[in-house]
């Protein structure tokens, strides 16, 4: 896929960048190479470079070339406002590049946590399910909420205008990144049909992101995933209780069916019935 944008834009996309020598400076290429072996995020496009891009607003163009294999969808993020950082994650014999794209307004929150949360998710899911098969895993900043595509996730949350942020905002950012990056496995890699069986998308992923979140921070979990919530899901008027095998266009009890009930059931299976061992 080739994406032509103004020369001062930075682009992140599904797939591996094929022409860094045409779209990055020599220094940025060196930073990208350094990031592959770094245990901490390395700035590929710095704050100063992003602010300079924002000022220039050139009319010249350049083309970013990406290559992706075995994907069912595609996405990209492009902006002249983007700061770009990255770090390598060892998955089997491969190095996966965990990366984030965000504006300066998202700092210091994003610079401190976004790429680390991506790397944590890639490592954790690979150990508990199967190795992540793609070369990159991306978190791109948006205004709110989250959405996933192969190799690319869009995630909300940013600090206040003065740069401060609450513990809730920090955990919200980390939680949504873990969840959306987790969707790279379910449904993107396994290729389940989330429109028909939403629980096989959101439910399996919510179970996994609950484990990954607790591994990051013991307080990073959603209360509806606790085992005792099974009572809430089962009691009440039986005529109003919808089965989890309900298509996604039915929004009645959507949150419980797609997210909560499958996660609680899997937690009970893991912790109570089978045991973690």
What is each PLM-predicted segment?
Residues 103-113, 194-195, 252-255, 268:
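Second-shell loop/turn segments in exported
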């Amino acid at each position: 896929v080739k994406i032509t944008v103004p020369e001062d834009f930075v682009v992140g996309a599904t797939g591996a960048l094929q022409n860094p020598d045409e779209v990055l400076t020599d220094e940025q290429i060196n930073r990208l190479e350094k990031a592959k072996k770094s245990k901490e995020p390395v700035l590929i496009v710095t704050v100063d470079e992003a602010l300079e891009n924002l000022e220039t607003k050139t009319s010249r163009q350049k083309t970013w070339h990406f290559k992706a294999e075995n994907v069912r969808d595609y996405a990209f993020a492009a902006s002249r406002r983007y700061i770009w950082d990255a770090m390598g994650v060892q998955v089997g014999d491969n190095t996966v590049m965990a990366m984030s794209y965000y504006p300066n307004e998202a700092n210091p929150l994003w610079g401190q946590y976004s790429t680390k949360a991506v790397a944590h998710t890639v490592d954790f899911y690979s150990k508990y399910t199967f190795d992540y098969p793609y070369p990159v895993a991306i978190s791109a900043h948006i205004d709110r909420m989250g959405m996933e595509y192969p190799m690319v996730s869009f995630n909300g949350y940013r600090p206040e205008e003065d740069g401060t942020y609450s513990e809730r905002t920090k955990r919200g950012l980390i939680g949504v990144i873990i969840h959306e990056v987790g969707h790279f496995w379910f449904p993107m890699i396994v290729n389940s049909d989330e429109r028909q069986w939403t629980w096989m998308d959101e439910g399996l992923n919510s179970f996994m992101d609950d484990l990954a979140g607790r591994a990051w921070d013991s307080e990073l979990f959603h209360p509806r995933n606790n085992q005792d919530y099974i009572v809430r899901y089962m009691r009440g008027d039986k005529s109003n209780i919808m089965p989890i095998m309900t298509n996604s266009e039915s929004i009645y009890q959507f949150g419980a069916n797609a997210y909560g009930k499958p996660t609680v059931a899997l937690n009970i299976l893991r912790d109570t019935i089978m045991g973690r061992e």
